[in-house]
Amino acid sequence: MARSLWTGSLSFGLVNVPVQLVSAVRDLDLHFRQLHAKDDMPIETQRVCSKEGKEVPYEEIGREYDGVVLTDEELSAADPAKTRTIDIESFVKLAEIDPLYFDHPYYLIPAGETDGTVRAYRLLAGVMEQSERAALGRFVLRTKEYLVAIRVRDGALALSTLRFHDEVRDTDGIPGAGGRTKPKEVKQAVKLIEALSTDWNPEGYDDEYRKRLQAIVRKKRKGGEIKRPEADPERTQPVPDLMAALEESLKSYA
């Protein structure tokens, strides 16, 4: 299990469940260091004053937003009160939460293995899973307060930070959002979707880009020559006859 990022209590009503927060995902991306191509030496980042051309010590760095300069002390006035509690404010149907609102995923795990802690954790997870509801609450991580949704995944409590409503763009102005469609085209499109439908199997989808990068690194390490493959022609032109295209697509899946 990943290291704990936060330790506190999950609070609902008069019940407090001691929990730890751990990341539910791991970063498998390849991270490259920047080097000077001339001598392969690492590149260093320096904070330089654009007027003086000199490096600025960290303690002399201020912050500006929209023309207003603020000190660290002034910025700290917005910091939320640090607490060790995730306060559940309400329960909602999980299906009602638009996936666009989900941000970063974590797991909540029992903080300790005492009988009372495990029983309370198991009770909450079981009831939430049975009711198909998610808990909404807030908590402070480091110096920022987050809105969170807590749901059940394979018997464990999974916490996702949520984006606030004004961070999610609406669909106004998107061509094709809403409007009328032709019944015959809808019927054929439904058939095509059904032909392509399958069960969700995450193991069936790999990060092909990362695999190609790893293969390039292995080949370069062995002294091989790296050549960029020819790209497949992109299909960017609109379909002149949508109905004909749907029917032709269905034939390939018949």
Task: Please state what every model-predicted region is.
Residues M1-A254:
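Boundary segments of small protein-protein interaction reader/adaptor domains
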